Swiss-Prot record:
Residues annotated as domain PRC barrel: 97-170
Family: Belongs to the RimM family.
Name of the protein this chain belongs to: Ribosome maturation factor RimM
Pfam families: PRC_RimM, RimM
Superkingdom of the source species: Bacteria
Length: 170
C-alpha cells in the first residue's frame, strides 16, 4: 500500500507500564472508534507502511493507550515511540461538509483575504483546544495558525488552498 492510500490518524507516544502498552496521540476526535479496525498500518515518517494487529485499545485518564501485536514489553514499546498510525482511505468514513482528514490539508496553499500567499500547510498540531496549522512561508519561516472559524474562512481542496483571515506579517 502506498503512502497516498493511507490516511495518518495519529502517532504512538510514550510507553505505558511494562507490558508493551503505548500512549496514542490521535489526530482526530474519536480514537476509541479505532478499536473497530483490527489491523492498523504503521510506519516511521518516510518509511513504507506495514500492517500491525491491534490487540487492545482503551481510554485511560485523559488519553488512550494501545497494545499492538509484537510489542510485548516496555523495551519494545520504547522502540515504537513516534511511529505513525494510519488506515487505508477506503476503510474510513467519508467526511461531512467542513470536516477534513489532516492529510488532506497538508500541501494546500494558505491565502489570506488580501490574496497574499502565507505559505503551504506542512503539518498540524493538536493543542487540546483546537488544531493548529503549521504553515511554511516562502521565506522558510513557519507560522502557526489556529484552525478555528475566525481564522480559517474556507478550505477549497479542489483549488488546493485554504482561505484565512491572517496578516502576511504575522
Amino acid at each position: 500500500m502506498t503512502g497516498n492510500d493511507i490516511v495518518v490518524l495519529g502517532r504512538l507516544a510514550d510507553p505505558y507500564g511494562i507490558q508493551g502498552w503505548l500512549w496514542l496521540y490521535p489526530f482526530g476526535d474519536d480514537p476509541l472508534a479505532w478499536a473497530e479496525m483490527p489491523v492498523w498500518w504503521i510506519a516511521r515518517e518516510g518509511e513504507p507502511w506495514r500492517e500491525c494487529r491491534l490487540k487492545s485499545l482503551k481510554a485511560h485518564g485523559n488519553g488512550v493507550v494501545v497494545l499492538l501485536d509484537g510489542v510485548a514489553d516496555r523495551t519494545a514499546a520504547e522502540s515504537m515511540k513516534g511511529v505513525l498510525v494510519g488506515a487505508p482511505r477506503e476503510a474510513l468514513p467519508t467526511t461531512e461538509k467542513n470536516e477534513f482528514y489532516w492529510t488532506d490539508l497538508i500541501g494546500l496553499d494558505v491565502i489570506n483575504t488580501a490574496d497574499e500567499r502565507i505559505g503551504k500547510v506542512v503539518g498540524l498540531i493538536e493543542t487540546g483546544a483546537n488544531s493548529v496549522l503549521r504553515v511554511m512561508g516562502d521565506d522558510k519561516v513557519e507560522r502557526l495558525l489556529p484552525f478555528v472559524s475566525a481564522v480559517v474562512l474556507a478550505v477549497e481542496k479542489e483549488a488546493g488552498q485554504i482561505r484565512v483571515e491572517w496578516g502576511s506579517d504575522w
